[in-house]
Amino acid sequence: MIRSPLRYPGGKSRVVEKIVALLPPFSEFREPFVGGGSVFIHLRQKFPDRKFWINDKYTELIAFWRELQSNSDNLIAQIWAWKRDFNDGKQLRRFLQANIENFSSLETAAAFFVFNRITFSGTTEAGGFSEQAFRLRFTDSSIERLTKMPEVLRDVKITNLDYEELINVPGEDVFLFLDPPYFSATSSALYGKNGKLHKNFDHERFAANLKKCPHRWLLTYDDSPFVRELFSFANIVSWNLMYGMRNVTENSKQLGSELLITNFDFESNAPLFSIHDLRFTIHE
């Protein structure tokens, strides 16, 4: 099974199968905050004949997914060229930061991937340079893995819209998986330029929109009284997850209590999976 080529803060790569076991049947899958795309990539391979629509407000991230889908050979060639030309990770990062405003879409996508591999926890423009990540994450094998992705992305709809578009567009047997910017202060600057996509997220508007959503959905969120109150109209279960953060030491991880929230019944959609298993700590 092909996995996401991206390192992503709060990504669900280690718990994909547990999340997938909870999903109801669907004909169309939409992911409004695709990020690293772990759940999408897993489902795309499991159900290759179904419709998939992925989206994110993060423009550089979507440039990466689009170029990987339609222009992968040139994208990979650009990444190889920068890896060959720069032996010093800090110099590479300075070069990209100094020139990114004038980059083409292809170069922007390639720069996004490089930032993802060489910054703390893959936080791209919002994260500081990590020498350890440069040495251990920006590897030949990390680039080679990109060659497997175009087939996964074939015929997938990829957009750079506000999440509300995906929630409201009519469709038959649609299911949405949502992993939005989290509410807690420890997760407030994870991605986007200066972390703005986390800092400026309107959680009240988000809850109000989901309450009106005509499709079935499953949502992951950090646990707090505020979030529980916002989604008091839905089904909520807690779980624990270990995740890396850029605002702690490079080798440390922080335990976070999270929520799975749905507008459908958990148990009826997971006959082979106990929802109570989610209450155990999962290491990511």
Q: PLM features: residue spans?
A:
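Short active-site oxyanion
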Residues: F26-F29, D49-K51, L153-K157, L210-W217
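Short, polar loop motifs at secondary-structure junctions
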Residues: G35-S38, R145, Y221-P225
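Long, positively charged, glycine-interspersed low-complexity recognition regions
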Residues: L197-H283
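Conserved N-terminal glycine/acidic-rich loop preference
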Residues: P5, G11, V15, P25-F29, ...
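Conserved beta-strand scaffold positions in the cores of enzyme catalytic domains, especially
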Residues: F52, I158, I236-S238
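A residue-level signal for conserved active-site and pocket-lining positions in enzyme catalytic cores
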Residues: G35, W65, F113, W217, ...
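SAM cofactor-binding core of SAM-dependent methyltransferases
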Residues: A21, P25-L96
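SAM-dependent nucleic-acid methyltransferase catalytic core
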Residues: M1-V15, L22, Q69-Y191, F201-D202, ...
